[in-house]
């Protein structure tokens, strides 16, 4: 198993390019299942564990692909199976993205429930509701979602989401792209990754209006065509790298970005005292002498993203005062707090709100990753901690960050990946 060993106290400086977005890559790769012929060529796909897992799932279904230097070539013309087994789905919740494309293409689909998935007010319910609104019959049997169409093809319909869901919006769009007739989705997620999926489906041949808004209308087509497509940048990786510069008192320029998609995060950095400038597709940040506390509330786009709240919490441990962090998407997404406190942070939880008391002098020690973004927060804390920090179980980090230690090293961080035996 791998760990990251960090010698803290180095100011990060330099210029680095942002990677392609994982959160847009996954639904786009799933959408290739909608075309029964030809070859897709997808650019700027990040080299991540989650991408490899998703490719394995598509290979199991019959797809063929080749991935090299950020370019993924994929053909789904030989896909015959519409059954996604538990052995593959359990590795990643985003595997549910194959439900809509398989159902739309074959008229039936069997997709294992993601591991540990409990029903009730969970996002998976919204995926199933969307399929039913398009005319599917859904049953849950022996741990599988079994979906069938009643009229050969899915039928366009009205989908009104009670809450915003990126995953359910993506699945609904993909299913509607091959449905007969027009589908309107209200309270749709408006995240840039959904916008990218809309452009991808439209380029395949399914017209979509309302792109970038919470109301989407999509015209279904009987067939869709393979295309060449350029992926968008990863705004969460970009925010994490900006936080790395800010927490170490450094300065950084990110290239190949879209500042418009990061307004809430850039505004938070500005309020913290950082100097933020944008120029075309680049973002520059210079850390101040003393960071100011900034309260944030994680909500659907264009508000502050939930995938950045753990990193922001690490940053606020160095701010001159108390900050409040609220997550209205995942109310209890605070697994990183005990580990940050082990490093010397002073963070309390009150009424599903984190109270960060800063500034605190952090001291390096061993800490345990619990999930993707929690891992990133521990790396950020390690960059500013005195002494050596060991971040264990970095396979979580590898799910969503493309060679993060190499990028940080290029900016001046003293960080290296090492093997370790968890049970020794």
Curated annotation (Swiss-Prot):
Biological-process GO terms, alphabetical: cell division; cell wall organization; peptidoglycan biosynthetic process; regulation of cell shape; UDP-N-acetylgalactosamine biosynthetic process
Subcellular location: Cytoplasm
Residues where UDP-N-acetyl-alpha-D-glucosamine binds: 93, 122-126, 307, 329
Gene Ontology MF annotations: UDP-N-acetylglucosamine 1-carboxyvinyltransferase activity
GO cellular component: cytoplasm
Catalysed reactions listed for this entry: phosphoenolpyruvate + UDP-N-acetyl-alpha-D-glucosamine = UDP-N-acetyl-3-O-(1-carboxyvinyl)-alpha-D-glucosamine + phosphate
Domain of life: Bacteria
Entry annotated with the keyword Ribonucleoprotein: no
Keyword Cell wall biogenesis/degradation included in the entry's annotation: yes
EC number, as in UniProt: 2.5.1.7
HAMAP family in UniProt: MurA
Family stated for the protein in its record: Belongs to the EPSP synthase family. MurA subfamily.
PANTHER family: UDP-N-ACETYLGLUCOSAMINE 1-CARBOXYVINYLTRANSFERASE
Name by which UniProt lists this protein: UDP-N-acetylglucosamine 1-carboxyvinyltransferase
Recorded name of the encoding gene: murA
């Amino acid at each position: 198993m791998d760990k990251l060993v960090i010698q803290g106290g180095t100011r990060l400086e330099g210029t680095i390019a942002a990677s392609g977005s994982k959160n847009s890559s996954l639904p786009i790769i799933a959408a290739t299942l909608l075309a029964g012929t030809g070859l897709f060529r997808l650019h700027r796909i990040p080299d991540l564990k989650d991408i490899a897992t998703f490719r394995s799932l598509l290979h199991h279904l019959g797809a063929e692909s080749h991935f090299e230097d950020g370019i993924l070539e994929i053909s789904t013309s030989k896909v015959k199976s519409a059954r996604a087994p538990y052995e593959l789905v359990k590795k990643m919740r985003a595997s549910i993205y194959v439900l809509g494309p398989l159902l739309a293409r074959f008229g039936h689909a069997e997709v294992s429930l993601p591991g540990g998935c409990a029903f009730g007010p969970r996002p998976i319910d919204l995926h199933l509701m969307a399929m039913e609104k398009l005319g599917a019959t859904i049953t849950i049997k022996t741990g599988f979602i079994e979906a069938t169409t009643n009229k050969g093809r899915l039928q366009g319909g009205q989908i009104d989401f009670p809450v915003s869901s990126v995953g359910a919006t993506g699945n609904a769009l993909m299913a509607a792209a091959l449905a007969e007739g027009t589908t309107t989705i209200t309270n749709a997620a408006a995240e840039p990754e959904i916008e990218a999926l809309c452009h991808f489906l439209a380029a395949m041949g399914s017209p979509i209006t309302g792109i970038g808004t919470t109301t989407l209308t999509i015209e279904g087509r009987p067939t869709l065509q393979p295309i060449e497509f350029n992926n968008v940048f990863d705004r969460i990786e970009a925010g994490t790298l900006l936080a790395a510069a800010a927490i170490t008192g450094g300065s950084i320029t990110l290239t190949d970005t879209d500042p418009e998609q990061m307004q809430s995060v850039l505004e938070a950095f500005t309020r913290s005292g950082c100097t933020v400038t944008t120029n075309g597709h680049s973002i520059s940040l210079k850390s101040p002498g003393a960071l100011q506390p900034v309260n944030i509330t994680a909500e659907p786009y264009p508000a502050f993203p939930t995938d950045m709240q753990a990193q922001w919490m690490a940053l606020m441990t160095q701010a001159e005062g108390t900050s409040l962090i609220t997550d209205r998407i995942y109310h209890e997404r605070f697994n990183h707090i005990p580990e940050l406190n082990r490093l010397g942070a002073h963070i309390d939880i009150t009424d599903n709100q984190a109270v960060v008391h800063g500034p605190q002098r952090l001291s390096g020690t061993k800490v345990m990753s619990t999930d993707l973004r929690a891992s990133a927060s521990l790396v950020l804390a390690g960059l500013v901690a005195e002494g050596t920090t060991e971040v264990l179980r970095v396979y979580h980090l590898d799910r969503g960050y493309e060679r993060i230690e190499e990028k940080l090293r290029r900016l001046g961080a003293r960080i290296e990946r090492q093997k370790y035996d968890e049970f020794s």
